[in-house]
């Protein structure tokens, strides 16, 4: 209701099991005449692979994994900065688990949370993502200065606010063009990186961990990521 705090992360009191999730997914598909993809968003946590396995069996079309380094204007800072695991580890473990269970082809994986530049996109695709999504990077393109005051509704740049006097500070046309410039630049950079790898399509990069090497990572981290040390 207006005037009350938003709870983030929001609880889902109608989902306490995979069976509950399956029923919700089925209901949503029925309500949309099976014309819309159903996306289930999960946090990057220590048992994310097991959770994703259940989601894949629920009938959902897409799993969205959110890494702990992602930005949010609603969650308490202690939650935002300390709860969860890096998206790279979560993504790699989910992709591997679904492959081992023979159900990777049944569902798509998208990821976000700390996707800050084109190289992050390349790494995510190589670790098994079908696509990525961005939020903070897009806000920066619009003109966000990372004031970290989204939750107050007093964004000085007119982005995270509903106040008319602040909203008018944001020029939609200029903001749109800046975002287009960002994505076009990333596309160009990704093409260059793939060219350096000798790869000519995103499909050839997807899940291709042979293209990655680890620097300063522990043996366990390398094992989870499914990559080798630099120099190997």
Ranges and model annotations:
Residues 1, 68, 163-164, 174, ...:
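Short, structured coil/loop segments at alpha-helix boundaries
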Residues 1, 12, 17, 155, ...:
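Short capping/connector residues at structural and topological boundaries
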Residues 1-7:
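ATP-dependent carboxylate/acyl-activation modules
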Residues 2, 136, 183-186:
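Hydrophobic alpha-helical segments, principally membrane-spanning helices and signal/leader peptides
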Residues 9-167:
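Glycine-rich phosphate/ribose-binding loops and adjacent secondary-structure elements
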Residues 13, 157-185, 191:
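Extended, intrinsically disordered, low-complexity segments
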Residues 174-232:
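C-terminal extensions of enzymes
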